[in-house]
From Swiss-Prot:
Protein's cellular compartments: Cytoplasm; Mitochondrion
Source organism per UniProt: Saccharomyces cerevisiae (strain ATCC 204508 / S288c)
Entry protein name: Cys-Gly metallodipeptidase DUG1
UniProt miscellaneous comment: Present with 22300 molecules/cell in log phase SD medium.
Binding of Zn(2+) 2, residues: 102, 137, 200
Record-stated family: Belongs to the peptidase M20A family.
Amino acid sequence: MSHSLTSVFQKIDSLKPQFFSRLTKAIQIPAVSSDESLRSKVFDKAKFISEQLSQSGFHDIKMVDLGIQPPPISTPNLSLPPVILSRFGSDPSKKTVLVYGHYDVQPAQLEDGWDTEPFKLVIDEAKGIMKGRGVTDDTGPLLSWINVVDAFKASGQEFPVNLVTCFEGMEESGSLKLDELIKKEANGYFKGVDAVCISDNYWLGTKKPVLTYGLRGCNYYQTIIEGPSADLHSGIFGGVVAEPMIDLMQVLGSLVDSKGKILIDGIDEMVAPLTEKEKALYKDIEFSVEELNAATGSKTSLYDKKEDILMHRWRYPSLSIHGVEGAFSAQGAKTVIPAKVFGKFSIRTVPDMDSEKLTSLVQKHCDAKFKSLNSPNKCRTELIHDGAYWVSDPFNAQFTAAKKATKLVYGVDPDFTREGGSIPITLTFQDALNTSVLLLPMGRGDDGAHSINEKLDISNFVGGMKTMAAYLQYYSESPEN
């Protein structure tokens, strides 16, 4: 290891209390982008991050206004959270790396089943974990880029690259209007960017680090069933009116079977066929059904073989039903017939699926199923947001640098993986900036992002920051841009 990285690593270790403090302050802000009533908190978190950037010596900090959020929304003239752009360094002799992250988080409430308050960071050094909403997705990794700059400065070592940040506040709600900003700034603020690095995904399992070169996309839909003009008493009207909730259950139940097979005609034909060369890539990846069971806390896997699990997680589409808006969901018993219900579901997309064609197939299927019910209610299905799938080259300069950095920190070569989740903006960065995108995960596969008791292992937090630092150093030394 070079002397410079040794010094930086030592500072990452010694500055850990400062980094814990920064993360604690960030986690306590409930920046839930999907909750319109909490939009001011998303703005508060943007301000906090901007202040942290300024204190750490970043310059040219811009809080880019994205305007008003488009429908469907309940709050008129709802402002979108800003995108935070900033720079650290502007040396033309150095390579420029853009780092992306998001400061918004998923909804979380104690009554959802959390062991602790979700917006109060719990640091359990005895167990070696930190727990809180956003700690792994994506507040912890986002702040780590700032922490790495602090560690280089404290060590007295020269920062190896020019760093550009692009931190958004709507990733959990479709990254609205970020595409347009990136395309607009491709020859502006982002001009000269040599590589893009994103730390917003996870190790495949819990033991071995990975580098990720592909993601599924995500099309999110809602089916709306509308009946009576107001909610009704089931004792008076049950059995004599067509209930929207019953219709909705029929429509949602027709989308996918209990084995995960999507039942919408035409989807299978859009999926790129599996080649023998691609199939061979799965053989050497370290993963087992036991790791999947550990990550889910159950034995509910639909597949027994490693290859089948990974292919259905990475390279085949899936359909998930997420919930129903407008229906009773609190504790206790309420005998109401809801007048209007919104069934939420999404499809994870893969090469070579086309979003417009997929939406057409989904709407056609839902309309046909509803028509078969002969219900007097009204039904429509609409796309809420979509994000494209993405695949990169795992053998280019920055993947090579990241591989070397991972080996230095963790002592093993990382697995090269694709991922089942979606970061819609990856493809936009790749195409608009005409550059490579690397996914450099910090957290483990059992972190529980989007779930209760979201956590990040302290060893991954510290090791992740060291990997980020070494990646930037090694990439700066690579012979090609």
